[in-house]
Amino acid sequence: MAMWVFGYGSLIWKTGFPFDESLPGFIKGYRRVFHQGSTDHRGTPDFPGRTVTLEAAHEEVCCGVAYKITKEEDKRDALLHLEVREKQYDQKEYLDFFTDSNASEPAVAGVMVYIASPDKKSNNNYLGPAPLEDIAKQIVKAKGPSGPNRDYLFNLEEALAQLGFKDKHVTDLANQVRHILSESEELDIDATAATANNV
């Protein structure tokens, strides 16, 4: 029996395990939010980054990619990889996955999804909601073993666009981060010019 894994964050562009088939599509009743703190990939314990998790939202969908794994050895390798990679995500759910918005039946029933819950007892890295500008400022500054937090956001934005998916939260956040970075560059240019004039 095949195992299916749904990716809605970095798994979209960086899978890290063998798979036999990938399907772009969506799950129902959830939305993607930057509410999870990352202290091991895109931030540190002293300054966490922010990565995506899922939040229940009755009328919404979350787009991503489902990966099919059939060989027993590949299943074991995938689970070992995911249990380490997603160790800060405290819930595993098995949800229906759709590829057609008009379909009443799922394309795949029971895709495995890792979710970081808002339960502080089981997930002490949960950061929760915050104003868009505050989240953007945190993402601009955060950096971890897997690289700058902003790269995670921009990679997610690009990966979704390549699949033809739109996610307003991701787009708005990426635009806010770009705005902060452009303002910072302008300040650096002004400071450099002022220093040159004083020489």
Swiss-Prot record:
Record flagged with keyword Lyase: yes
Enzyme class: lyase
EC number(s) from the headed UniProt entry: 4.3.2.7
GO biological processes: glutathione catabolic process
Metal-binding recorded as keyword: no
Pfam family, one: ChaC
Predominant cellular place of this UniProt entry's protein: cytoplasm
Domain of life the protein comes from: Eukaryota
Binding positions (substrate): 5-10
UniProt xrefs under InterPro entries: ChaC (IPR006840), GGCT-like (IPR013024), GGCT-like_sf (IPR036568)
CDD domains found in the cross-reference section: GGCT_like (cd06661)
Compartments in which it is found: Cytoplasm
Cofactor note: Binds 2 Mn(2+) ions per subunit.
Function text: Converts GSH to 5-oxoproline and cysteine-glycine (Cys-Gly) dipeptide in vitro and plays a significant role in glutathione (GSH) homeostasis. Has no activity towards gamma-glutamyl-L-cysteine but possesses very low activity towards gamma-glutamyl-L-alanine.
Protein name per Swiss-Prot or TrEMBL: Gamma-glutamylcyclotransferase 2-3
